[in-house]
């Protein structure tokens, strides 16, 4: 049977969401309506079950305002990791970093179907995410506070869904068949264009080659410049030799003063 993430319903109330939250909810609906076949066996949609913490992150640090200007650098990841955003709803969302550095914490629900080896425990998840520890750890060491970091940068993921095979192996979007990629990437491209319209980034930096390629394809007509930096995944041998100094060199090569 094809796997399908959950589709959220809009809460009742007098006001409708706007800005980044509206884009996020629309993406959750579009991506949540798609089906994925074997070897994908489980699909998690943290924009639905971790909506509270995800939207807290968007509104606190993303929406342009007095403390979060337009024209920042947008760091774009690929998709949620099983022990990061899948648990917390925040990109590169290592539990300790999200809770203790970003100050974001909220009740997290559960996807309709969970792999028994990959349960969603929200902020009670005992495992850390190396990529998130590296990215947010760099932000903390370099900038000191979230406010100082988010004056310069914002972080999102291109795709909101987590894909797992029957044995619990993580499956990244680039491994999906073309027939499944096409509608998914169309939804993600649209959301990225809409996010860029809200944020007006001076530069989009793909965290890894996949994200940079998708950003170039989605944002090319708008003229937003796109670059890339090394992904912090421990599966990347080069990242294990000292990710932070490597990406600082890459960012400086792009003309950024750190």
Show which residues each predicted segment covers.
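Charged, low-complexity surface segments at secondary-structure and domain boundaries
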Residues: 1-4, 119-123, 232
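Ser/Thr/Pro-rich low-complexity tandem-repeat tracts
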Residues: 3-18
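A polyanion-binding, active-site-adjacent surface
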Residues: 19-203, 212-213, 227, 237, ...
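Flexible loop residues that form catalytic
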Residues: 209
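Extended hydrophobic/aromatic segments used for targeting, binding, or gating
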Residues: 217-242
């Amino acid at each position: 049977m094809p796997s399908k993430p959950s589709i959220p319903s809009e809460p009742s109330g007098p006001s409708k969401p706007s800005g980044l939250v509206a884009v996020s909810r629309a993406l959750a609906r579009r991506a949540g309506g798609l089906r994925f076949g074997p070897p994908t066996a489980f699909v998690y949609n943290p924009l639905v079950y971790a909506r509270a913490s995800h939207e807290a992150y968007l509104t606190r640090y993303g929406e342009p305002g007095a403390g979060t200007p337009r024209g920042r650098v947008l760091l774009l990841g690929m998709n949620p990791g099983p022990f990061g955003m899948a648990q917390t709803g925040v990109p590169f969302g290592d539990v300790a970093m999200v809770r203790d550095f970003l100050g974001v914490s909220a009740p997290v629900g559960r996807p309709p179907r969970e792999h028994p080896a990959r349960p969603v425990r929200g902020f009670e998840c005992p495992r850390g995410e190396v990529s998130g520890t590296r990215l947010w750890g760099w932000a903390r060491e370099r900038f000191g506070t979230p406010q100082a970091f988010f004056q310069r940068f914002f972080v999102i993921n291109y795709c909101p869904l987590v894909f797992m095979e029957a044995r619990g192996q993580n499956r990244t979007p680039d491994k999906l068949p073309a027939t499944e990629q096409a509608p998914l990437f169309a939804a993600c491209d649209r959301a990225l264009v809409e996010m860029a319209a809200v944020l007006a980034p001076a530069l989009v930096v793909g965290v890894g080659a996949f994200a940079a390629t998708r950003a170039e394809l989605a944002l090319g007509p708008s003229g937003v410049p796109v670059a890339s930096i090394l992904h912090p995944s421990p599966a990347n041998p080069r990242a294990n030799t000292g990710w932070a100094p490597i990406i600082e060199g890459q960012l400086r090569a792009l003309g950024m003063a750190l």
